[in-house]
């Protein structure tokens, strides 16, 4: 790789077609930077420090020095120029860059990460988003890495995310309906006047350079004059799930629709239980106190009313389940809010709240969704604390998991469907939302640090398998930054 060569990406690709230029950009990954002969030799000889997160910021220095003219944005490299001085930054040798990144203050690292988020919006459609996620443990795969189940989830040189999904596939369903749920939250759930941010790029963890997330939506957040996200002490994260298996048809032979009609006409707890039970694989699992939940369903309840399947003996919680037990204690006394939406076929196309109530279901800390929320909580906490100064040193974001249920459109639906007012139309290509279950998520400090420590250990194993000479990630990185509730 030519990371350390003077020629920029723009200079190298002037005579290439745009597709070839993008392919070239896609090769500038963290893995390929570490493989550079100059970097391998410097690590092997001890000429440079190889610890994280500093080596990640060395990579970012060379990446943006190489591509800034090509992407037409100089903000990231400009931060390095302010830290190092313009002349030194543009003529620095590898050892000088490593020294500068080692001495870099955490709030400067956070500024760099803020601009990376800005430049990677569009997520899977943005090649830079793919490039910067190399060598990173993402929130959606955190549980797999903790369990060391990674045949399809490589940390380094991961398989590119498939973007051309078949329109009827579960993935395509979730992607196209996520926008609708964001509108529902901003129009019907959040108080009027509260700022919402609904598009995020890749958020690298500035404290370790190992973890990263891409959020769905935040409230009590806004855009700065530089178009970076400004989180606050009251920021709330919403992780959205639109699961294909919940989709049903508006017809009498669909058993889910039959149960939904009863719920719609008489919104209440028992009607919701009957509705959830009508789904082939219900999303709520009954678990008695002191017992270990499975990892099958992402919502739990202590109430036997939610016990849908044949009787099963569950294992007792033991000392080996300390993390699960602590997380259950933090979450089991919460309730989820259920919002029943009006049927737009009956309201001239208008979708609003028909009714709402609370139910005794909470998030399953053994499920991947909990780990996803856990890492989002950790990284947003660090962004707030590093960018807002002492006033937000001990603040923490709220986190909610939103389960959205949809039905298929039919001939009775109006051509134009909208949420609350005619300013917020729902695209005719998406399904009709029928209800939301909004579940609060709480993350205790001890289990968070322990989980991150396990993931860092696995990252270190993976990096040793990948390179002859590798970066070093101390497990103490799991506790960097104040994330104590």
From Swiss-Prot:
Disulfide bridges in this chain: none
UniProt xrefs under Gene3D superfamilies: Herpesvirus alkaline exonuclease, N-terminal domain
Chain positions of site Required for function: 178, 216, 239, 241
Residue ranges of coiled coil: none
One annotated GO molecular function: exonuclease activity
Main location: host cell
Hydrolase keyword on record: yes
Subcellular locations according to the entry: Host nucleus; Host cytoplasm
Keywords: Decay of host mRNAs by virus, Early protein, Endonuclease, Eukaryotic host gene expression shutoff by virus, Exonuclease, Host cytoplasm, Host gene expression shutoff by virus, Host mRNA suppression by virus, Host nucleus, Host-virus interaction, Hydrolase, Nuclease, RNA-binding
Database matches in InterPro entries: Herpes_alk_exo (IPR001616), Restrct_endonuc-II-like (IPR011335), Viral_alk_exo (IPR034720)
Gene Ontology CC: host cell cytoplasm; host cell nucleus
Record-listed E.C. numbers: 3.1.-.-
GO terms, biological process: symbiont-mediated degradation of host mRNA; symbiont-mediated suppression of host gene expression
Family: Belongs to the herpesviridae alkaline nuclease family.
Biological role: Plays a role in processing non linear or branched viral DNA intermediates in order to promote the production of mature packaged unit-length linear progeny viral DNA molecules. Exhibits endonuclease and exonuclease activities and accepts both double-stranded and single-stranded DNA as substrate. Exonuclease digestion of DNA is in the 5'-> 3' direction and the products are 5'-monophosphate nucleosides. Additionally, forms a recombinase with the major DNA-binding protein, which displays strand exchange activity.
Quaternary state and interactors: Forms a complex with the DNA polymerase, the DNA polymerase processivity factor, and the major DNA binding protein.
HAMAP family, alphabetized: HSV_AN
Protein's name according to its UniProt entry: Shutoff alkaline exonuclease
Organism: Alcelaphine herpesvirus 1 (strain C500) (AlHV-1)
Lineage: Viruses, Duplodnaviria, Heunggongvirae, Peploviricota, Herviviricetes
């Amino acid at each position: 790789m030519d990371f350390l060569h003077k020629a920029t990406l723009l200079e190298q690709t002037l005579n290439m077609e745009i597709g070839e230029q993008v392919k070239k950009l896609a090769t500038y990954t963290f893995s390929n930077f570490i493989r550079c002969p100059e970097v391998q030799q410097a690590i092997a000889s001890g000429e440079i420090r190889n610890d994280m997160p500093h080596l990640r910021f060395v990579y970012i220095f060379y990446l943006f020095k190489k591509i800034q003219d090509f992407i037409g944005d100089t903000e990231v490299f400009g931060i390095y120029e302010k830290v190092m001085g313009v002349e030194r930054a543009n003529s620095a040798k590898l050892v000088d860059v490593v020294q500068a990144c080692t001495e870099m203050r955490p709030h400067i690292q956070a500024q760099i990460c803020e601009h990376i988020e800005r430049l990677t919006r569009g997520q899977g459609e943005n090649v830079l988003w793919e490039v910067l996620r190399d060598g990173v443990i993402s929130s959606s795969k955190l549980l797999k890495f903790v369990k060391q189940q990674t045949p399809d989830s490589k940390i380094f040189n991961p398989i590119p995310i498939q973007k051309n999904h078949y329109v009827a596939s579960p993935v395509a369903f979730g992607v196209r309906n996520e926008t609708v749920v964001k509108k529902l939250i901003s129009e019907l759930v959040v108080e009027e006047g509260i700022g919402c941010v609904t598009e995020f790029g890749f958020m690298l963890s500035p404290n370790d350079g190992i973890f990263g997330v891409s959020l769905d939506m935040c409230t009590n957040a806004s855009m700065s004059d530089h178009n970076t996200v400004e989180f606050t002490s009251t920021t709330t994260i919403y992780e959205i799930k639109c699961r294909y298996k919940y989709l049903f048809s508006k017809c009498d032979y669909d058993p889910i629709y039959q149960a939904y009609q009863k719920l719609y006409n008489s919104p209440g707890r028992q009607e919701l239980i009957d509705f959830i039970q009508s789904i082939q694989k219900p999303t709520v699992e009954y678990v008695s106190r002191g017992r270990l939940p499975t990892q099958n369903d992402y919502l739990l309840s202590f109430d036997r009313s939610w016990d849908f399947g044949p009787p099963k003996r569950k294992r007792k919680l033991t000392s080996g389940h300390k993390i699960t037990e602590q997380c259950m204690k933090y979450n089991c006394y919460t309730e989820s809010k259920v919002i029943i939406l009006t049927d737009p076929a009956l309201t001239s196309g208008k979708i609003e709240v028909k009714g709402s109530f609370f139910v005794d279901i909470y998030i399953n800390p053994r499920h991947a969704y909990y780990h996803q929320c856990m890492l989002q909580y950790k990284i947003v906490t660090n962004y707030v604390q590093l960018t807002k100064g002492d006033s937000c040193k001990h603040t923490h974001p709220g986190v909610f998991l939103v389960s959205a249920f949809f039905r298929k459109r039919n001939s009775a639906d109006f051509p134009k469907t909208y949420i609350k007012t005619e300013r917020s139309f729902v695209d005719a290509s998406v399904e009709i939302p029928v209800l939301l279950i909004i579940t609060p998520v709480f993350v205790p400090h001890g289990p968070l640090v322990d989980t991150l420590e396990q993931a860092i250990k696995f990252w270190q194993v993976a990096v040793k398998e990948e390179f002859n000479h590798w970066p070093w990630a101390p497990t103490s990185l799991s506790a960097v930054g104040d994330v104590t509730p």
